[in-house]
Amino acid sequence: MASLLANGISSFSPQPTSDSSKSPKGFHPKPESLKFPSPKSLNPTRPIFKLRADVGIDSRPIGASESSSSGTSTVSSTDKLQQYFQNLDYDKKYGFVEDIDSFTIPKGLSEETIRLISKLKEEPDWMLEFRFKAYAKFLKLEEPKWSDNRYPSINFQDMCYYSAPKKKPTLNSLDEVDPQLLEYFDKLGVPLTEQKRLANVAVDAVIDSVSIATTHRKTLEKSGVIFCSISEAIREYPDLIKKYLGRVVPSDDNYYAALNSAVFSDGSFCYIPKNTRCPMPISTYFRINAMETGQFERTLIVAEEGSFVEYLEGCTAPSYDTNQLHAAVVELYCGKGAEIKYSTVQNWYAGDEQGKGGIYNFVTKRGLCAGDRSKISWTQVETGSAITWKYPSVVLEGDDSVGEFYSVALTNNYQQADTGTKMIHKGKNTKSRIISKGISAGHSRNCYRGLVQVQSKAEGAKNTSTCDSMLIGDKAAANTYPYIQVKNPSAKVEHEASTSKIGEDQLFYFQQRGIDHERALAAMISGFCRDVFNKLPDEFGAEVNQLMSIKLEGSVG
């Protein structure tokens, strides 16, 4: 343990080092103190649900006129990348602010704040008690300082914890949703109306602190699938919520999980009954609109024995000059023989090229493979946020259960990302696979932090981990912190890592064959990320390939 502490992870929360029949909560290794610049980030464009597979990439060099030749440019590749990213107009596509008539509670965090949120959500007494207990735990915990991220202290009294449109919709009918809100999501590329909405994906649209619409509910109900906002689920399905809320991520799991448990206002709930295959992918689109308001959503997905569900998640926020906090919790429960595939394209506003503004994205995501032969897969593309801090994890409790993690994390300018995963092997013959790709450009810092833990009763556990980093330019940094704990001699654990750099000689090689900087970078980055892109669902695949080939050409962030 001493050598692990010296090598640099301290409090890599939420999982335990000791064997336990309960869901693990944490081991806390201490990292060396690293001096990073204050959080800053990039200006990206990232469509989420609006797929455009037909869009190509301009074959001209970045910043060149139509008459320019790809072989005559004297601008360096790094300059071209920065020039290219400055031309990406996140502000126009997602950075706008809609003037929505909203009700916002006063700033500040206290028991009265929590009581007011619970009252506004029309919650039962047991839910208010859950919140109060979480808040009491939050007050006793200290904000973790062990990550590679560096940012000013957060003033939790100087933000709003609830903001919602005054015209409250009846979620059973899209006809009663405020037309302004429907038009708002249309502009974001998330159509909700009957005529325009995505035909084969059920969407729960969340703005600030409330869900404003959920599509395809009747179709899902025919299969017995429950898909609604978690606020509605607390009122309509209290027995299910009592059984599963906090079962995978306890309210005292970590600092931000405790905060979320106290003040979460909405999110999505999905329940797939026994031996049911969800007839379509389900998805949630999160949008922050109000200034100085944090978003604290809660997602709970339960897949009973023999069921299957695919979940998609996307998000954007306006281009504010100030930072905003997004502290979410995601819990996945997987029964015997069930499977959950969870895919995310994280597209929060990352700030401007000087690092002003952007979202602090501090998220706890964990899945529990509770039953034998169950499977949970996390696939994520992280391109936004001024700071990203998250470790989607899987606890492999059932025998022969499987956990997978596929990730691309992109940072540019002064963005910071400390992300990775944890695979906790508890059952017999469990398997896990980790593929992580990190791309860093500008002055950004990109850290992969991963834990593979094989507990003493996990006979025949197997893990393979691949962690690759790519650097663009000479000022970015990439760190990899693999953490391996094996307590059973029958385990087979493999880990490999690499760091590469896109250099002028490689780009010159492409140019000699008539391929300009833009296409050369797109080709190299696309190939670098292929193992992860291939795991994305079709609903994301076309968009992410375009996103990477365009934005990643400088490393996106």
UniProtKB/Swiss-Prot annotation:
Gene Ontology MF term list: ATPase-coupled transmembrane transporter activity
GO cellular component: chloroplast; chloroplast stroma
Major subcellular location class: plastid
Keywords: Chloroplast, Plastid, Transit peptide
Gene Ontology process terms (BP): intracellular iron ion homeostasis; iron-sulfur cluster assembly; regulation of response to red or far red light
A Pfam short name: SUFBD_core
Compartment list: Plastid, Chloroplast
Name this protein carries in UniProt: Iron-sulfur cluster assembly SufBD family protein ABCI8, chloroplastic
Organism: Arabidopsis thaliana (Mouse-ear cress)
Family, similarity comment: Belongs to the iron-sulfur cluster assembly SufBD family.
Lineage: Eukaryota, Viridiplantae, Streptophyta, Embryophyta, Tracheophyta
Effects seen without this gene: Plant have an enhanced hypocotyl elongation in far-red light, and accumulates protoporphyrin IX.
Region called Disordered, residue ranges: 1-47
Stretches with biased composition (Low complexity): 10-24
Role: Involved in light signaling, probably by mediating the transport and correct distribution of protoporphyrin IX, a chlorophyll precursor, in response to far-red light.
Description of what induces expression: By PHYA.
Transit peptide: 1-52
Origin: domain of life: Eukaryota
